[in-house]
UniProtKB/Swiss-Prot annotation:
SUPFAM superfamilies the UniProt entry points to: NAD kinase/diacylglycerol kinase-like (SSF111331)
UniProt organism field: Streptococcus agalactiae serotype III (strain NEM316)
Record-stated family: Belongs to the NAD kinase family.
Name of the protein in question: NAD kinase
Keywords (A to Z) from UniProt: ATP-binding, Cytoplasm, Kinase, NAD, NADP, Nucleotide-binding, Transferase
Cofactor(s) it depends on: a divalent metal cation
Molecular functions (GO terms): ATP binding; metal ion binding; NAD binding; NAD+ kinase activity
Signal peptide annotation: none
Length: 278
């Protein structure tokens, strides 16, 4: 846990909500609480704290809205549905959130994010960041690509595609593919195959691989064509991808640390296991 530098100026707060009725109600209550408080200034421009109201998808959108300001921004999530992995507060805990923010001392919890670098055949380079995951697929035909880990050719992959996830993203698409669940404070990436071909002719490892912070992953397609690349909830299509590189970004996402911070394992239990039967 680290602490962000604080000054005597008012804390700038951005409130981002989805269009659901309950989310709008929460947003209105937060606006009313901070609007006339001299210690806070409501603004979506250059905020110190971003309050995301909705679900994990809303927080993903908020992350990408402010991904160029990660050094200066801390996030906090309010869930208006079932408990999310990025949310510490439910919609009925708004008063607790308001009180915690009024007593905030700048403490934060940081999680690693994914750096994505796409190189095209024409020399163009596209750079992006992902909070959860990125995939590369070739929809119309089997994807054939070399998987290179830390400059070592690990395997030649044949199948539908490849997913690379962050620890926080390990509970999303990665888990549905049989990948491991990683605690978000672990600085590592996870590479997971999507429907790989495994028979007497073609072989892949067939299981997820955990990649440490110091190593990088390269996916090098071996066939020309159109590739579909997802970066969190955004999907793009590129023709003739030379390679796509994945590594842990120099930046991280910072969350407001409060007494109400829900432990990661509580979130996993709530999402996938629930209360045990007696």
């Amino acid at each position: 846990m680290t602490q962000m530098n604080f000054t005597d100026r008012a804390t700038r707060v951005a409130i981002i909500a989805n269009g659901k009725y309950q989310s709008k109600r929460v947003a209105s209550k937060l606006f009313a609480a901070f609007k006339h408080d001299p210690d806070f200034y409501l603004s979506k421009k250059d905020p110190d704290i971003v309050i995301s109201i909705g679900g994990d998808g809303m927080l993903l959108s908020a992350f990408h809205m402010y991904e160029k300001q990660l050094d200066k921004v801390r996030f906090v999530g309010v869930h208006t549905g079932h408990l999310g992995f990025y949310t510490d507060y439910r919609d009925f805990e708004v008063d607790t959130l308001i009180n915690n923010l009024k007593n905030d001392e700048g403490e934060q919890i940081s999680y690693p994010i994914l750096k994505v670098t796409i190189t095209l055949e024409d020399g163009r380079v596209i750079r992006a960041r992902a909070l959860n995951e990125s995939t590369i697929k070739r929809i119309e035909k089997t994807m054939v690509a070399d998987v290179v880990i830390n400059q070592v050719v690990f395997e030649r992959f044949r199948g539908d595609g490849i997913l690379v996830s962050t620890p926080t993203g390990s509970t999303a698409y990665n888990k549905s593919l049989g990948g491991a669940v990683l605690h978000p404070t672990i600085e590592a990436l996870q590479l997971t195959e999507i429907s790989s071909l495994n028979n007497r002719v073609y072989r892949t490892l067939g299981s997820s691989v955990i990649i440490p912070k110091k190593d990088a992953i390269e996916i090098v397609p071996k066939r020309v064509g159109v590739y579909t690349i997802s970066i969190d909830n955004k999907t793009v299509h590129y023709k003739n991808v030379t390679k796509i590189e994945y590594s842990i970004d120099e930046k991280s996402i910072n969350f407001v640390s409060t007494p109400s911070h829900t432990s990661f394992w509580e979130r996993v239990n709530d999402a996938f296991i629930g209360e045990p039967e007696h």
